[in-house]
Design a protein with these regions (language model features):
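Flexible, solvent-exposed loop/hinge segments and secondary-structure transition points
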Residues: 5-6, 13, 26, 31-151, ...
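Extracytoplasmic/periplasmic C-terminal soluble domains
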Residues: 147-193
Length: 193
């Protein structure tokens, strides 16, 4: 009898705590996140980019731009597939990874005459952790300006100003790097014509 009382003393509180945590973690927390998501711009579905009332992309999901008249995005190991978002999972000493990086370097140099290998920002030739980065550094965008200026027959100075205008500063001036959203930049580029 004494053993049963001791078991009740320990098991009942453990079961109660388990039930409380299941309700908290499986019901209340997801509901709270869903409500907060609905209060954000885009209502938790992501910030859509519209052109003439049509969705052309999302600000937080990178897209492939490979035409010389556009700023190129960062390479994607996931093929820009949002459902299969992932990095390459290959380390910097992996021979396959090194081949991929070299292929990206060769492609970039072939399309950007006058640029030296050591001038290319790493983000333009390496995969990101998510495979869907929508942003580049200002340097990653500016190194592409000459190619785009030639193809579109625009002034390079005009394009440098465009990049500067679309550069988002770090949050509160200290959190994170300056960045340029490639989709927004390319849409603004189309409006220059």
């Amino acid at each position: 009898m004494i053993k049963q009382n001791k078991m009740k003393k320990y098991i009942l509180p453990a079961l109660k705590l388990t039930l409380v945590l299941v309700i908290l973690c499986s019901v209340l927390y997801p509901l709270l996140i869903a409500v907060v998501g609905r209060l954000t711009p885009g209502q938790g579905k992501g910030e859509t980019v519209l052109v003439n009332g049509k969705v052309v992309g999302y600000t937080l999901i990178g897209q492939k731009f490979s035409d010389d008249k556009y700023f190129w995005s960062r390479p994607s190991a996931a093929g820009y597939n949002a459902a299969g978002s992932s990095g390459s999972n290959k380390g910097p000493s992996n021979p396959d990874y090194l081949k991929d990086v070299q292929a990206h370097i060769d492609t970039f140099l072939a399309h950007n005459p006058g640029v030296r290998k050591d001038e290319i920002p790493a983000e333009l030739v390496t995969y990101s952790g998510s495979g869907l980065d929508p942003d580049l550094s200002p340097a990653g965008a500016k190194i592409q300006v000459k190619r785009i200026a030639v193809v579109r027959k625009l002034s390079a100075d005009k394009l440098y100003i465009l990049v500067d205008n679309y550069t988002e500063k770090p949050l509160l001036g200290i959190f994170g790097p300056a960045k340029v959203n490639v989709l927004k930049l390319n849409l603004a580029l189309d409006n220059l014509q």
